[in-house]
Amino acid sequence: MNRAPITALLLSVLCVPQLWSAESTRQILTPKPPAEARVNGPTIYGARPGHQFIYRIPCTGERPVRFAAQGLPASLHLDPLTGIITGHAPDKTGTYAVTLQASNSNGRSSRLFRIVVGDTLALTPPMGWNDWYSYYEQVTDKVMRQAADRMISSGMADFGYQYVNVDGGWQVNTNGKDPEVGGEPRDPQGNIRPNRRFPDMQALAAYIHNKGLKAGLYTSPGPVDCADSTGSYQHEEADARTFAAWGFDFLKYDWCSYTTVAPAKPTLADMRKPYDLMGGILKKQDRDIVFNLCQYGMGDVWTWGADAGGNAWRTTGDLGMTKDDRLPAFYNIGITNAALSSYAGPGHWNDPDYLLIGNVGDAFKWEQSQERLPTSLTPDEQYSYVSMWSLMAAPLFFAGDMTALDDFTLGLLCNSEVIDVDQDALGWQARVIRRSPDELILEKPLEDGSVAVGLFNLTGSSRKMTASLTDLGLSGGQKLRDLWRQKEIGEVTGSFSHEVTRHGVILVRFSPMRIGR
């Protein structure tokens, strides 16, 4: 094949109007998964020696599917019918290379899965669901169980979503207004109590685990959380032991009322103190608990969050409380987060907040109304949102109503090629190639030598955007693939251009062409 520059040819391929834009309708770009069994999910996974291990192999395809795992350590057991791996991580540190296999009547597939036993968890960004922007303080045990059920039945778990996380609202509320959530916050021994909406936290975690999923919890280092429910101040050791005994696998630690016990003008040491404390305590537990620091980016947390034991840290304030007249909030939050790429990597991730798509509540009115309405974001804005989070190796936590999932939202959440960008084992956050008031270009190197690139139009009208291979640090001929449609587009040398809709995105993957094919 002639390898001469083919920019003009590529442009003629790219300029199919419906290829990128979903603005006029809620066009589902993600293809339906094929009928044959296909193993999805990360290719690397961190665990601590001897700790309890649970992992559900993400797999699409027509059921029933039969699973196998070559090279699985002897301390672990795979259920061949459910694909759930349980047991305990090996006592010996090191990397255990496992080949995950899945087969059904339509075909089979396999995927390398490296279990790295050591001190680092979350070697890829955590994925799951958090209730806050849907239920706020009205969350219940029933809501969490339904969410776990829906994570399986919707197919989200088949693409790697695994954490089912309850935010604030499970604890006893200290303001005493509602007897259902009021009462004594701790038992006579000082152990934290859930409110009456959560009759048995250990049973809830077990319910989630029985599906092969993981359970997440929330508290504050202050006396109370942001809605006056019990915090962990001066009970850090006891609470960490309780959370581990209940069986929780993830802890979000929200600054909230810690302001009332910190100095009026806190130093960096003051800001670090509660997170250093809890991070050290969690490491002493006999359970793997991913630690999520939520203190809104104060004190440049990205420079010290990993040293405090954090696996992810919020880089800004709440996305749901951010407003802007020009751009949707996710753009402003994302652009801030994008500048911090050098601080992210395996086991420690910049967290720009949750995916507020689907049906969500109003963060400004949550105390007055529990109504959950469809997001006001346009379809193109939603594609931009998920594309940006994936390029930035952000934790992917859906925060919409799990009971109101529709096909369009599932298409956004469950595109295996887009998720692979987020979960890539190299663990690089995309770097900013170009940033202006009108456009943003992000580039993320991937483990196989390819690069994922997002071209984001920040203006209120369509505009032509161009990226050259020189801009991207690439050379020679490159194959170009549309990640949302999961289709090869063509080949390019030099540069490529395309008209991008308002607030829209082009998300592509460049791979070196092989000479002599």
List PLM regions with ranges.
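C-terminal edge beta-strand
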Residues: 26, 107-119
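Solvent-exposed, low-complexity, repeat-rich "mucin-like" stalks and linkers
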Residues: 37-62
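A short beta-strand micro-motif common to beta-rich folds, especially ectodomain repeats
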Residues: 57, 93-106
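Strand-loop-strand motifs at the edges of beta-sheets in extracellular beta-sandwich domains
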Residues: 75-91
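Aromatic-lined carbohydrate-binding/catalytic grooves of carbohydrate-active enzymes
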Residues: 133, 147, 151-265
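Glycan-recognition surfaces
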Residues: 238, 288-401
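Carbohydrate-binding surface patches
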Residues: 383, 389-392, 397-399, 434-474, ...
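C-terminal beta-strand-rich structural cap/linker in extracellular carbohydrate-active enzymes
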Residues: 491-517
